[in-house]
Amino acid sequence: MADAAVIEKLEAGFKKLEAATDCKSLLKKYLTKEVFDKLKDKKTSLGATLLDVIQSGVENLDSGVGIYAPDAEAYTLFAPLFDPIIEDYHVGFKQTDKHPNKDFGDVNSFVNVDPEGKFVISTRVRCGRSMQGYPFNPCLTESQYKEMEAKVSSTLSSLEGELKGTYYPLTGMSKEVQQKLIDDHFLFKEGDRFLQAANACRYWPAGRGIYHNDNKTFLVWVNEEDHLRIISMQMGGDLGQVFRRLTSAVNEIEKRIPFSHHDRLGFLTFCPTNLGTTVRASVHIKLPKLAANREKLEEVAGKYNLQVRGTRGEHTEAEGGIYDISNKRRMGLTEFQAVKEMQDGILELIKIEKEMI
């Protein structure tokens, strides 16, 4: 059971949320007094409480979601809060639904969405994974961070062929290596205020690192927001090649490292927005004509469940009519379906852009 000091902090946090009338987070929407009273004294076997779940959203009242899972068990123990938030964010994934088993499908059915190279600047597909037997960031000890890094770096070092590369630990990284990784847009920084408030950046930079292959088309972030972020990317629009590289990497890593998986929610991640397939397939794409007709762009994107962001990701503007467009759905569908929906949507956007000449 949570101790008195934690419950006192929780009570104060709940009051703060109640008083914040302009707060629009899903946390505020679903943390009713009834749910709060049911969960406030619960504690996972690794010692995580409701405070670990909600503290980022209490601290940052402008959060969109406002909750994180401190460990895998939190998704079950604090389900009365997580489940409605998951249903709201992952539209259509009801509390009675079960996420399907992993299925990359026929990876050869994916194509180059822009063979002429006129529209798509680059293509990227990523997924997140958590290692079984370890909690998520807020509950990890420094020695666990180091132990995980050792397991992951030895696994990655055994990769062969196109995936063969180098692991760079953030601890003791030289200025030259740091600059090189920044120039390649590979280096991740210490977490933003949302992650900081969730206690996701403790013992930084212990256990954190970056692996990339020699061609710079395959990248793994170790212990950033999730235990593993596995990323495949390249210039141009060859989604097929990018997806095939990702799936072969995930399959290789999975042989050596067991991942946290939940019967109902799929692959588990620190943030509930990434659950399920955890897959985000995106392109940087130039659509000057559609950019001038934002309504049409949003209409087509909506039809294919695509998310349209600015050039540099969330909360940024489109520079020179270049957008970051990705699949929005992660839950209740397979990896194959998520990427296929994105491919169909991008092909449709390019077709419309061409017709607008």
UniProtKB/Swiss-Prot annotation:
* Effect ascribed to mutating R193K: Retains almost 90% of the catalytic activity of the wild-type in the forward reaction. Altered three-dimensional conformation and impaired structural stability of the protein
Tell me how activity varies with pH. Answer: Optimum pH is 8.5.
Q: Quick one: which residues bind L-arginine? A: G64, V65, G66, I67, Y68, E225, C271, E314
Q: Kindly list the biological process annotations in GO that this record carries.
A: female gonad development; phosphocreatine biosynthetic process
| Reaction catalysed by this enzyme | L-arginine + ATP = N(omega)-phospho-L-arginine + ADP + H(+)
- Transferase: present as a keyword of the record? yes
Pfam families registered for this protein in UniProt = ATP-gua_Ptrans, ATP-gua_PtransN
PROSITE patterns under this entry?
Answer: PHOSPHAGEN_KINASE, PHOSPHAGEN_KINASE_C, PHOSPHAGEN_KINASE_N
Q: Where is the Phosphagen kinase N-terminal domain?
A: 9-91
Group of enzyme by EC: transferase
Q: Does the keyword DNA-binding apply?
A: no
Q: Which residues cross the membrane?
A: none
Activity as a function of temperature is given as: Optimum temperature is 30 degrees Celsius.
Per the UniProt record, which EC number(s) apply here? 2.7.3.3
Q: Which GO terms describe its cellular component?
A: extracellular space
Domain Phosphagen kinase C-terminal spans what residues?
Answer: 119-356
Q: Which UniProt keywords apply?
A: Allergen, ATP-binding, Kinase, Nucleotide-binding, Transferase
As one GO molecular function, the record gives:
ATP binding
Q: Which residues bind ATP?
A: 122-126, 185, 229, 280-284, 309-314
What this chain does, per the record?
Catalyzes the reversible transfer of high energy ATP gamma-phosphate group to L-arginine.
The family assignment reads: Belongs to the ATP:guanido phosphotransferase family.
Q: Output this protein's name.
A: Arginine kinase Met e 2
